[in-house]
Amino acid sequence: MNKRVQAFLTKMQEKELDGIIINNLKNVYYLTGFWGSNGTVFISRDRQVLVTDSRYIIAVKQETSGFEIVADRDELAVIAGIVKDMGLTRIGFEDEISVSYYHRMQAAFAGLDLFPQTQFVEGLRMIKDEAEIAAIRKACSISDQAFRDALDFIKPGKTEIEIANFLDFRMRELGASGLSFDTILASGINSSKPHAHPMHKPVELGEAITMDFGCLYDHYVSDMTRTIYLGHVSDEQAEIYNTVLKANQALIDQAKAGLGFRDFDKIPRDIIIEAGYGDYFTHGIGHGIGLDIHEEPYFSQTSRETIKTGMALTDEPGIYIEGKYGVRIEDDILITETGCELLTLAPKELIVI
């Protein structure tokens, strides 16, 4: 039995459940090592079962150990039979499912108690092991190099889409298996939109260019943002940029295990507020990364939780002035026993090309 399943069973016992159904495919991968488009896991104290279809039987045998493997397209009927044979009554399930799937579950487990579980596996995924850290670190290094190469590619007249495509293709050339999300590439006024879509707009001299991008390596993500300037930069642009950079660096300097989620957000936000731009920082400071680009933990001013060693997090302060421009600087960091390790190493001093 692997360590992840052991941790799963401990948490399940704390919730007084007899078994749990997992059908989020990334959670299935996390627990079993199997990556595919069809897979459902049932875990109880005495049996751990993976149900998939015949297309994946060879792959499952190669990628998974410690699980019973069943090839059947009616996974709920298979699991219901196991539950009945074992005499189990309290069954948990992931709560992010469709209404139609929930109705199927009610029919398959008629007469049993079903208990929705929020972020059950995602809570375990918050703390990364060495293999996960290695994959995230590699994804970050690919993103770093793609950004450095993009600095030579970007010229006046290149469109946002052309620059975004360059980043995307370059990350694949460097070994990425895919993108962790659709690249955000925003220039000029568009950079005031935190999640702008790249357009057929040419970049022009004097504009800010914000690039938010990342890649996949062994299923794990990177997530990085850099803002640069084309040709020249105004005093106001430089002031705003350096304020965001100061906020970003302050969190890197102070992030450590035991820091409250509220303080994780407050440290950089206070710097932006003190500079007079508090109303222009309109999103959270960061989130966890791993198999998903946005995953636990999330940060808010009401949370009482604390940072823990092994968390991989983003640090992404920004200032966005509607009708003018915006700045965001985003790094990926790993919480260590002595503080934090910066995973994204691409330059972030004020860059004018």
Task: Identify the residue ranges that each predicted region occupies.
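Active-site neighborhoods and metal-handling regions in enzymes and metal-associated proteins
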Residues: M1-I353
